[in-house]
Amino acid sequence: MASTTTCTRFTDEYQLFEELGKGAFSVVRRCMKIPTGQEYAAKIINTKKLSARDHQKLEREARICRLLKHPNIVRLHDSISEEGFHYLVFDLVTGGELFEDIVAREYYSEADASHCIQQILESVNHCHLNGIVHRDLKPENLLLASKSKGAAVKLADFGLAIEVQGDQQAWFGFAGTPGYLSPEVLRKDPYGKPVDMWACGVILYILLVGYPPFWDEDQHRLYQQIKAGAYDFPSPEWDTVTPEAKDLINKMLTINPAKRITASEALKHPWICQRSTVASMMHRQETVDCLKKFNARRKLKGAILTTMLATRNFSAAKSLLKKPDGVKINNKANVVTSPKENIPTPALEPQTTVIHNPDGNKESTESSNTTIEDEDVKARKQEIIKVTEQLIEAINNGDFEAYTKICDPGLTAFEPEALGNLVEGMDFHRFYFENALPKINKPIHTIILNPHVHLVGDDAACIAYIRLTQYMDGNGMPKTMQSEETRVWHRRDGKWQNIHFHRSGSPTVPIKPPCIPNGKENFSGGTSLWQNI
């Protein structure tokens, strides 16, 4: 029998040196190409620990990095697969993080910030021209080529980058770093290249004053700020920033992605292309001082989060009851709040709010300068939560057509109204869409409380949650119904379909009775129809 030849090209051609960094499945080490003596950084991935989906991500990252050749992007020189390991050979960048370099400078002005963001925009523009969205622009991924004065800024880490066609907008999953996420990602809307420009706006804001535009200890409140575009230019630090700089930030931090400035447009902005005459040359000592604190906070909280991830007990029951020793956790996930306090909604518009904490713990955003998406797992879980929201919205809207698109024709269900019987198919549910749901004329607000998603391979998932439904009864009094639900999802032809659900507790949405004596509504003790889907 012929023996299989194992590739040893990396081992033969490269010599490894000290460790430069470490990830969950990878380590970065300095290396030298033996024939030339040229030094590089080798990202070494332990492929024995990777799932099939992780392998796809690795291939995508290598494919994207091979495509991008630009002086402001860390370049991939080689991609080699050996038994048990994959090697990505990158530029060796020795200048450290851009933000750390800025605080070590004796002089730093608005014009310097303009030069920094210009290089970042050049890298982003190159990505976008090649159909690549980075999705994780943040200070940790902005490096300097060397320690020399005036060294080029280099964009790094394309682990979350995606490939898009032209100006394609789609839901690519919930990925990024909390303070840099765009409103459309937080709304779980289709998104594309504009998400990178939003992150550039956040970075530029920090470059000018040393602190971020959106900030809150509580992640939910932080996300509300971002979705509302709630930032300002407070005195006195912003009084010395030119109007042109503020104008560029406003154009980058535009809530509507269709109206947000593009990378190529930003490069033509006067504050960028006419820097010498437009940007201020005044030294910004307060910015440097604030940036030092910002950097220290990033590093400290990053270290705490790393420790937590390494030592966390992932038992959901324990984590709901006990905080890890020595770590303060802002655990407000079980508090039900209404989005009406911050975002006005039409009176009769059915709403679905997700208040969740998939792992049972919720760290404060101060510790969350780490990229969301445990390599893609969280994005996939968010996909399941999103499609569950869509299904419940279809129910609230009485939209049977939308409901059937999300559900498998052979949907099976256990629910109180079926009296202990297993219901199969759509006819049982059709009755309620055609006869009960059209009679709803009151506001309905559905809350998915604390959903837990279990992924079963690449194409199946199970979600369990508490479903709260708020409504106004016939007397104008607010009421709330609760049920516990579990739904099983299966992906067919790239689309998720609900194949089974199990609901306990009370039915969810009260419906006006078809016939009420004396024309009086009676939700408190009279007969009522109930939604059963």
UniProtKB/Swiss-Prot annotation:
Residues with Phosphothreonine modification: 287, 306-307, 365, 370-371
Induction: By cocaine in cardiomyocytes.
S-S bonds: none
Residues forming the catalytic site: 136 (proton acceptor)
Residue positions where Phosphoserine is found in the record: 315, 319, 364, 367, 524, 528
UniProt region (Disordered), positions on chain: 337-375
Start and end residues of each Protein kinase domain: 14-272
Assembly description: CAMK2 is composed of 4 different chains: alpha (CAMK2A), beta (CAMK2B), gamma (CAMK2G), and delta (CAMK2D). The different isoforms assemble into homo- or heteromultimeric holoenzymes composed of 12 subunits with two hexameric rings stacked one on top of the other. Interacts with RRAD and CACNB2.
Protein name, entry field: Calcium/calmodulin-dependent protein kinase type II subunit delta
Source species: Rattus norvegicus
